[in-house]
Amino acid sequence: MLLNSSFISLPSFFKSQELGRTNLLIHRNGSPLLCYATNTNVSQRKSANYQPNIWNYDILQSLKHDYEDARYVDRSRRLQEEVKRMIKDENVNILELIDTVKQLGLSYHFEEEIGEALDRFLSLEKCSGRNNFGRSLHETALRFRLLREYGYDISPDIFEKFKDHNGNFKACLVQDIKGMLSLYDASFLSYEGEQILDEANAFTSIHLKDLSEGRSSILIDQVNHSLELPLYRRVQSLEARWFIDSYENRKDANKVLLEAAKLNFNIVQSTLQQDLKEMSRWWKGMGLAPRLSFGRDRLMECFFWAAGMTPFEPQFSNIRKGLTKVCSLITLIDDIYDVYGTLDELELFTTAVESWDINAIQILPEYMKIFFLALYTTVNDFTYDTIKETGHDILPYLVKVWSDMLKAFLQEAKWCHNKHMPKFDDYLNNAWVSVSGVVLLTHSYFLLNRNITKEGLGYLENCPMLLQTPSIIFRLCNDLATSSAELERGEGANSIICYMNENGVSEEVAYKHIQNLLDQTWKKMNKDRVINSPSSKYFSETIINLARISHCTYQYGDGHGAPDTLAKNRIKALILEPIN
């Protein structure tokens, strides 16, 4: 069971909930609070001693990317035509080709051709009567992974033939490193209750770790890469960057695919740099960082997060920029609620946001006034652009999710103030909202969908699980990486501490429980993606990408709040440094 019944029965996040929320928005009451901001001395406030910004925004403005030139775009288009012909060729190993194209970051150019090729592949299989018993482990696992990734109904029972009479995976499979890696990768597309894939994951994990020790080859590098973080859970754009470098070293590398992949990556990266320069000017113009110097100045990290959530395609600039704005505001308000604001001030701010009344700033302290105006202006600008383009007023939806997030922030602040350690389920029911995933995804939905319908809005309201599961993954990844630092700052509850306190277990046991909960939530999201898939495939991809960028950012620590050299190198690889 993923969580207890309180998780399964959570009401829609668009309906009022009894449990307080503490993230980025407001607390709605029937009447305004009849109190005013406290005159707390700055020296009396907590300080998080956050790491300063490590990026020079003036230097970012000087970025110049060679691949902005139209001749590269023309060359890329010619190469794409060659790749299309390859996909349509019935004599190629189509599954291997599709997998390579996908890992190289090229598949978005060929969605129609790939769909037709997979349909053709399945049709030929059916006509020829070929069954699974003639397939190798690699072929079977690759077939399963690709078909499930592309939404085909395929059962994991196809792996039964690789078991012995005792129901265990055959010992002889262990020496097939390529097949074992393919089975390992496939196991991460499992649904709840698919025991054979759980067994496959356990079997391959143990033996691949043993097989990779003391060896060196391109295949072993791939094994170590997947063991570090599974292929399906990786940010696809960063994975393309890594795979291009790996693929170039292979003797069987196709030169057309390799050149097409390099050009495509660099062209999209040049678009990202233009987006980043615009966002750098926006952030500097907002003037929030110097006025709210107690908080984290993380424009670059927020842009990286937005780029990771958004499909890695040049036409999604508006979505990247919109999410960068949202993420930047979330980061600062999180610091207000976690560290700087007094409880009275947080109550006032939560109520002000929920009322969405500009006059509410009159009773806010000065530092909150500027942030309220920044939030008010940004959200209203999103609403204005959407009304202008679609005729739909999305303001109630945006204010609602911001309000719910701030209520969740406020609840956490109260727990901390009262030195209260909540039960694990109470914490998580609040924390999946406070982590801000719903705010990010709701903005994404409206930024991606300019053809907004009543049916679509109903879908957004009535399918909360699609937003809840990636938010839980986001929260758990965050807690695993930041719990120690948060405790040092006196920020109180997180999932690990709550579980330890409630169950009387060690930190190691609690970590294992959270990791298991992460895996179970991924299974739930994998299934929800199929049975409750939104009309927009891009929004569906963005939902999964939220979970992926969470793993990426918190894989080695707090890559957002305290970015280290590894975090900086990831940003440079995706945004700043072209492939030679």
Curated annotation (Swiss-Prot):
Q: Where does Mg(2+) 3 bind?
A: N478, T482, E486
Query: What is the protein's name according to its record?
Result: Tricyclene synthase TPS4, chloroplastic
Transit peptide feature range:
1-41
In which pathway does this enzyme or protein participate?
A: Secondary metabolite biosynthesis; terpenoid biosynthesis
Q: What is the lineage of its organism?
A: Eukaryota, Viridiplantae, Streptophyta, Embryophyta, Tracheophyta
Keyword Transit peptide included in the entry's annotation: yes
Q: Which residues bind Mg(2+) 2?
A: D334, D338
Cofactors demanded by this protein: Mg(2+); Mn(2+)
Similarity comment: Belongs to the terpene synthase family. Tpsb subfamily.
Q: Which GO terms describe its biological process?
A: defense response; diterpenoid biosynthetic process; response to herbivore; response to jasmonic acid; response to wounding
**Per its database record, what is this protein's job?**
Promotes the emission of terpenes volatile organic compounds (VOC) in response to damage mediated by arthropod herbivores (e.g. Spodoptera exigua), probably to attract natural enemies of the herbivores.
The terms under GO molecular function for this entry are:
(E)-beta-ocimene synthase activity; magnesium ion binding; terpene synthase activity; tricyclene synthase activity
Q: Where is this motif: DDXXD motif?
A: 334-338
User: What note about domains is in the entry?
Assistant: The Asp-Asp-Xaa-Xaa-Asp/Glu (DDXXD/E) motif is important for the catalytic activity, presumably through binding to Mg(2+).
